Amino acid sequence: MRAERTSFLLALGLLMAGIRSVHCLPENVVVKDQRRRVDSHTLASSNTDFAFSLYKQLALKNPNKNVMFSPLSVSMALAFLSLGARGPTLTEILEGLKFNLTEIQETQIHQGFQHLLQALNRPSNQLQLSVGNAMFVQEELKLLDKFIEDARVLYSSEAFPTNFRDSEAARSLINDYVKNKTQGKIEELFKYLSPRTVLVLVNYIYFKAQWKTRFDPKHTEQAEFHVSKNKTVEVPMMTLDLETPYFRDKELGCMLVELTYSSNDSALFILPDEGKMQDLEAKLTPETLTRWRNSLQPRRIHELYLPKFSIKSNYELNDTLSQMGIKKIFTDADLSGITGTADLVVSQVVHGAALDVDEEGTEGAAATGIGIERTFLRIIVRVNRPFLIAVVLKDTQSIIFLGKVTNPSEA
């Protein structure tokens, strides 16, 4: 029976686009207390929990490599998919996204993402941020009107008729769409599409912001970055003198420096002590992030050395999500809320991400080095060994990018 089921792809870009949605509830769902709408903190907490869980899986599967992804893009795409899920398939997706279904209703989760999209799309002259979803649908496939409407209203999804029988043309159509929405940062989200594909869901996010205090390119010089005990590479190292939030975590053996964008969003650089990366990764939790944010205090850093980098990644997440408990969508899925029949199964979950950090700021579509030197009141921070980075939006506390930079010289 499984061999007869129809291919369905879930694509996760590293960008997002314009959202203008109005309040809408799924039919036949009564919210007992309308005031119990999911607030941004509740949504951010679940999304952060999911972000760190997914990070740990990706880091485990990609040892000694750069890791970069957009947890918000992945979670939003899966929440979008859950609109059409029923029964145990629905429960598995939402619990896999770290929602406690004894405390929160499905309707509230969708409302939470709806309001998050609205918040992310507020116009700003200090930040380029676009967020969106899209469906590419086999031309003769009949989707339920309710799914189409919920997708449009709650997730601002566009829909495009597509001829998947010409799989190469369909692949080009989708890849070009994502490339356009991500300002060229994600050039080839799909390497391959099966002719049996009938539906592709895409989520994309684009983020570009300038540092509040910019690095001077004239001071950027080649310097050593210690990838491991046995490997050192030369990278462009930026330097800056500034006052910025800083915290030395003696308990976890790491140092944190937060750099703020002109939009007041921020990038948090987490620098483990030598030999402490794996220990630190194991202890990444929402509670740890909250403690760090509460502990950051403005400090004068006379010399901050930070490598320029441009990292792109592409992940197939089927096995990773299965290990995180989201299994049924790939095997015996009940996605009857999409077409009215239970003949759809997700064949591939693909996520592409790109993040650039330079003297101007950040752009993303997705050994011996972290030394602190003190001479009286003079603080010098050298980021010249593997480190973690989290890009966080201030108003929603959403982690839009999370990753590990092991080798800045590798794209």
From Swiss-Prot:
One of its GO terms (molecular function) is serine-type endopeptidase inhibitor activity. Glycans are attached at residues 100, 180, 230, 264, 318. Its main location: cytoplasm. Keywords: Cytoplasmic vesicle, Glycoprotein, Protease inhibitor, Secreted, Serine protease inhibitor, Signal. It is found in: Cytoplasmic vesicle, Secretory vesicle, Chromaffin granule; Secreted. The record marks 377-378 as: Reactive bond. PROSITE patterns: SERPIN. The keyword Membrane does not apply. Residues 1-24 form the signal peptide. GO terms for cellular component: chromaffin granule; cytoplasmic vesicle; extracellular space. Gene3D superfamilies: Alpha-1-antitrypsin, domain 1, Antithrombin, subunit I, domain 2. InterPro entries: Serpin_CS, Serpin_dom, Serpin_fam, Serpin_sf, Serpin_sf_1, Serpin_sf_2. It holds the Pfam family Serpin. Homodimer. Serine protease inhibitor. Belongs to the serpin family. This is Serpin A3-5. It comes from Bos taurus.
